[in-house]
Amino acid sequence: MKKTIQVAKRALKYNDVPIGAIVVMDGKIIASGYNRKKVTKNPMDHAEIIALKRAARKIGDWRLNNCVLYSTLEPCIMCAGAILHYRIKRVVFGTVEPKFGGVVSNDRIFDIKTLNHSVDYEFGVFEEEIKGMMRDFFKKVRGKVF
């Protein structure tokens, strides 16, 4: 998760929300991504989406069955759907996202039993450090706390 936090901080250079994601296969990082919405002017360029695309390109297959995705923040509903489509087996994230989170905060996408793929998940890893990073960012950018 420490590496994911480092990746998230790259977004700060572009004044974007500091969210980072890495994809790990067989204990090795194969891809990473950070929020790039401000740079690309594309609201779908979330850290998780970028990391998933890069991982698929790296291994030459969209099926990331043996991979774990680490993210600083709870994946949103869109990213949770992408994680299912890429067949990620496990997701670990630092802290919840009460407004748009799609894993535990709102729609709980991974808990839908009728889907053809299931994802194990864990959260709360480095939670206070990540909350502090998010709080500092939003206080600076919007004058209010996340």
Cite the ranges covered by each PLM segment:
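Short beta->alpha transition motifs characteristic of CBS
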Residues: 30-37
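Short beta-strand scaffold segments in enzyme catalytic cores
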Residues: 19-27
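Helix-adjacent hinge/juxtasegments
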Residues: 41-45, 49-84
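Residues that line or immediately flank small-molecule/substrate-binding pockets and catalytic motifs
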Residues: 37, 71, 95
